[in-house]
Design a protein with these regions (language model features):
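N-terminal, Lys/Arg- and Ser/Thr-rich interaction peptides
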Residues: 1-26, 177-185
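Beta-strand elements of well-folded, non-transmembrane domains
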Residues: 10-14, 58-60, 107-113
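Acidic, low-complexity glycine/serine/threonine-rich segments
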Residues: 30-34
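Internal, well-folded beta-alpha domain core
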Residues: 67-192
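Extracellular structured ligand-interaction cores
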Residues: 5, 51, 100-102
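Short, well-structured hydrophobic secondary-structure segments
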Residues: 36-66
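Short acidic, gly/pro-rich beta-turn/loop elements at beta-sheet edges
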Residues: 18, 64, 115
């Protein structure tokens, strides 16, 4: 017997999922998958028992400048006026932001899907809000397997990448392999 899911699709105008390796890199593109701790955070925020699977698609990237301030404070003394000023150094970092991200979350029950369908999510940062759109869709496991998009298959092995540390498992390393079905860029444009 095949597993079936109740699928809620979230959409938004843009989204940036900060890679765990990017601290103050001059140019950083959004991660195109969700880590185990991100999914766990979403599960807790939605108040559901389980998020079984997900797929993430988008329409491409837009590089946008983001002004940041350093943690340190510079002290500057102007001797003529006997004036002391304090400033924080600024820099502009370029971010490759996903345009029109679509996040398909698969739930095991209609109850969890309905609960999720009434709430918004943030992909990673508070400003990257995605809202549920369209009806809750029933999908068999086979249909969901064919859904275009990218996801991280949570596993540790020779081909696995380290994708960060889990805030929910005492900082344990998280590993996975990227799983791409179809074209994750503009894959849903026709079906929106």
């Amino acid at each position: 017997m095949s597993t079936s899911y109740q699928v809620v699709t979230y959409t938004g105008p843009f989204g940036f999922i900060k890679p765990w390796t990017a601290v103050r890199d001059e140019l950083t593109y959004s991660q195109q998958f969700l880590t185990p701790s991100t999914i766990e955070g979403m599960r807790q925020k939605l108040g559901v028992l389980e998020i079984c699977r997900y797929r993430l698609t988008h329409d491409g990237f837009s590089v946008q400048g983001e002004t940041t301030q350093s943690a340190g404070i510079d002290r500057k003394t102007v001797k003529k006026r006997q004036e002391v000023t304090y400033q924080r150094a600024t820099a502009v970092l370029d971010r490759g932001v996903m345009l029109n991200p679509r996040l398909h979350l698969a739930f095991p029950s209609q109850d969890d899907a309905q609960k999720a369908h009434r709430q918004h999510l943030c992909l990673s940062r508070n400003e990257d809000v995605v809202m549920p759109g369209g009806p809750i869709r029933y999908r068999s496991e086979y249909e969901f397997n064919d859904t275009p998009g990218s996801k991280l298959r949570y596993e540790k092995g020779d081909d696995a990448l380290m994708v960060g540390y889990s805030r929910y498992k005492n900082g344990a390393p998280m590993y996975g392999t990227l799983d791409i079905t179809g074209d994750p860029v503009s894959a849903d444009r026709a079906s929106r």
